[in-house]
């Protein structure tokens, strides 16, 4: 019997709705990965509602929880670590301590960093120290880096002038250490308004993918978290980076189709679960080079 992969997911959690681990854990489980959720914050709901309750996990709890797993002899079974929203830079450094601990036991373990830097216009606010940590420390340790356009701009220190400029900015990130950069949302001058575009960049090649942009009265939250989680899950299940990229685009689109059909503000993960595991749509990425 083929072994089921195990993944430690260290990011935010909301009691109601879907963001962070609440957007990523169930879909990763649904495609066949055992997920160990470690919640960096626990909020009542995501911050775009304008109000929320909850608290940030104390940084020292992260390595303590990792050591607790080690104490029962299970840490070596961890095949990958996913990190997302951070409440503080100290939390981020605690995560890197955990990543190093896991990689010392299992050198093949992968680390995907979703460098959430905040989007004030959407109500997602991240302290500057977190952005600095992601730029200066986390990127160097990550096997996979999954920024959106705003985060890519922050890494590059500028805005793109074209699609090929986005590609150049993502390629420059490879020099910081990651094996691959997945840009979860592209935005650049001249981009067609009816499409949603993503980019995968590796040392071996780069691919661009465009899918239809769906209209919502209020844009659902958690799409980036869902994207990062599914991409890493599919890699653990044996997909090539390109196959994982294309599968993720299809599965995320299926979730958004179901969410749109329900006129829902929250992602309809449960209703779309079969389509997450077995997408009916398919998107083919196009090779792109400078």
From Swiss-Prot:
Sites where the protein binds ATP: 114, 151, 184, 211-214
Pathway: Cofactor metabolism; pyridoxal 5'-phosphate salvage; pyridoxal 5'-phosphate from pyridoxal: step 1/1
GO molecular function terms noted in the UniProt entry: ATP binding; magnesium ion binding; pyridoxal kinase activity
One record GO biological process: pyridoxal 5'-phosphate salvage
Binding-site positions, substrate: 12, 47-48, 225
Obligatory cofactor(s): Mg(2+)
Keyword Chaperone belongs to the record: no
The keyword Nucleotide-binding belongs to this UniProt entry's keyword annotation: yes
Annotated CDD domains: pyridoxal_pyridoxamine_kinase
The EC number(s) this enzyme carries: 2.7.1.35
Reactions catalysed according to its record: pyridoxal + ATP = pyridoxal 5'-phosphate + ADP + H(+)
InterPro entries tied to this protein: PM/HMP-P_kinase-1, PyrdxlKinase, Pyridoxal_kinase_PdxY, Ribokinase-like
One CC-aspect GO term: cytosol
Primary enzyme class: transferase
Keywords, in A-Z order: ATP-binding, Kinase, Magnesium, Nucleotide-binding, Transferase
Subunit structure and binding partners: Homodimer.
Similarity comment: family membership: Belongs to the pyridoxine kinase family. PdxY subfamily.
Physiological role: Pyridoxal kinase involved in the salvage pathway of pyridoxal 5'-phosphate (PLP). Catalyzes the phosphorylation of pyridoxal to PLP.
Cited PANTHER family: PYRIDOXAL KINASE (PTHR10534:SF2)
Name this protein carries in UniProt: Pyridoxal kinase PdxY
Taxonomic classification: Bacteria, Pseudomonadati, Pseudomonadota, Gammaproteobacteria, Pseudomonadales
Gene expressing this chain: pdxY
């Amino acid at each position: 019997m083929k072994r089921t992969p195990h993944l430690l997911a260290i990011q935010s959690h909301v009691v109601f709705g879907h963001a962070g681990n609440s957007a990523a854990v169930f879909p990763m489980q649904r495609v066949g990965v055992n997920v160990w959720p470690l919640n960096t914050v626990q909020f009542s709901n995501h911050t775009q509602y304008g109000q929320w309750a909850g608290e940030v996990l104390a940084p020292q709890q992260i390595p303590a929880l990792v050591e607790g797993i080690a104490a029962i002899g299970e840490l070596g079974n961890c095949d990958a670590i996913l990190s997302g929203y951070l409440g503080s830079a100290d939390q981020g450094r605690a995560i890197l301590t955990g990543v190093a601990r896991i990689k010392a036991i299992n050198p093949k373990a992968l680390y995907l960093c979703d460098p959430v830097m905040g989007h004030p216009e959407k109500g997602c606010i991240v302290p500057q120290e977190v952005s600095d940590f992601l730029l200066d420390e986390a990127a160097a340790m990550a096997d996979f880096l999954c920024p959106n356009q705003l985060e890519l701009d922050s890494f590059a220190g500028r805005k793109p002038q074209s699609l090929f400029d986005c590609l150049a900015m993502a390629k420059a990130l490879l020099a910081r250490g990651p094996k691959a950069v997945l840009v979860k949302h592209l935005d650049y001058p001249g981009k067609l308004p009816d499409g949603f575009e993503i980019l995968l960049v590796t040392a071996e090649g780069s691919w661009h993918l465009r899918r239809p942009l769906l209209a919502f009265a209020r844009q659902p939250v958690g799409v980036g978290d869902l994207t990062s989680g599914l991409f890493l899950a599919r890699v653990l299940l044996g997909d090539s980076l390109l196959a994982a990229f294309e599968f993720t685009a299809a599965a995320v689109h299926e979730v958004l189709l179901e969410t749109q059909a329900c006129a829902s503000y929250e992602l309809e993960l449960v209703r779309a679960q079969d389509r997450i595991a077995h997408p009916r749509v398919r998107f083919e990425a196009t090779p792109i080079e400078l």
